[in-house]
């Protein structure tokens, strides 16, 4: 599915017909943005003609758009630059299948045009597109401004994901400190997988953005270099934040193990107290279980002897409980 936005005769035009887009582009437009959402990783015939015949993009670049690899890429050609960058668009089950939330955005950028190609529906591109329709003089005042808006949204997706992870980790920490359960460890490991997957893709993204910070590239005007350096700095900051989260998840595992150890110690302490209390009871019951006549039998009789034995047991239990409480053993 294709959609395009550009200026024609002083007014903004949106178009979804590839042939009409090609016709208007050949009339030397000042700036055009074409967005192609691939269905089943395939280009339609009209889209193929647009990319190969109208823009004359290299077939290897087009092939890279059809088969995402989750590695950034910048390739410089005679009349354009091809790139592939990656961001995160969280899905409902992202904690179990985080890789499905990672998208690849391919782009062709040259003098007066930007072509974006992706295999998944990217909502942030729709937002930028609608803003460009509503405020074309602001959002599409230059190629650099349009490209910056796209890059900024991609990099910001990492920050949004980190906020989600922080909320999850804070909740886990509270649960662990209150009452650690086996399910908490499963959640920690799922979070760890998400963080390490983010780190894997984020570390390599800087190599793509650094190209647009160089003063000797032919695409970005000097006054806009500072914007793309901001993108590069933001990406570097995200990398450091992700590295910090990897350290935090290790600390969270240590907190869980410590909490489990404390909980186990409390259980063992309780069981030890029970066993210690029962021990004198067993001794007394074993003593009175012997088939002999005890001296107190002649004083208390059969019933009295039973109460005498039970009394010794109760007094022993109470005395031990008072002693344990005084020692703060439970």
Model-derived features: positions:
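Peripheral, non-transmembrane regulatory/ligand-interaction domains of membrane transport proteins
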Residues: 1-215, 219-221, 227-230, 234-237, ...
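Hydrophobic alpha-helical transmembrane segments and their immediately adjacent juxtamembrane loops
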Residues: 233-330
């Amino acid at each position: 599915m294709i959609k395009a936005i550009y200026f024609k005769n002083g007014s903004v035009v949106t178009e979804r017909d590839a042939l009409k887009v090609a016709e208007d582009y050949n009339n030397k437009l000042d700036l055009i943005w074409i967005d192609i959402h691939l269905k089943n990783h395939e280009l339609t015939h009209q889209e193929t003609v647009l990319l190969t015949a109208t823009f004359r993009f290299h077939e290897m670049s087009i092939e890279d758009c059809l088969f995402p690899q989750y590695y950034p890429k910048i390739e410089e050609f005679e009349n354009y630059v091809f790139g592939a960058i990656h961001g995160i668009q969280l899905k409902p089950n992202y904690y179990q299948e985080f890789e499905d939330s990672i998208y690849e955005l391919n782009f062709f950028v040259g003098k007066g045009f930007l072509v974006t190609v992706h295999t998944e529906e990217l909502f942030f591109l729709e937002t930028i597109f609608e803003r460009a329709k509503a405020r074309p003089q602001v959002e599409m005042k230059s190629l650099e401004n349009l490209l910056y808006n796209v890059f900024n949204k991609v990099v910001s997706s990492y920050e949004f994901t980190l906020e989600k992870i922080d909320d999850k980790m804070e909740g886990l920490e509270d649960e662990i400190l209150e009452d650690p359960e086996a399910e908490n460890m499963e959640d920690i490991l799922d979070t760890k997988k998400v963080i390490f997957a983010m780190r894997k893709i984020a570390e390599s993204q800087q190599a793509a953005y650094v190209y647009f910070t160089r003063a000797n590239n032919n695409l970005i005007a000097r006054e806009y270099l500072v914007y793309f350096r901001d993108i590069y700095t933001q990406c570097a900051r995200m990398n450091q934040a992700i590295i910090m989260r990897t350290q935090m998840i290790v600390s969270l595992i240590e907190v869980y193990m410590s909490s489990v150890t404390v909980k186990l110690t409390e259980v063992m302490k309780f069981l030890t107290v029970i066993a210690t209390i029962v021990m004198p009871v067993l001794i007394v019951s074993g003593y009175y279980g012997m088939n002999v006549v005890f001296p107190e039998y002649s004083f208390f009789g059969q019933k009295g002897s039973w109460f005498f034995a039970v009394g010794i047991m109760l007094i022993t239990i109470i005395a031990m409980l008072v002693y344990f409480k005084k020692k703060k053993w439970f």
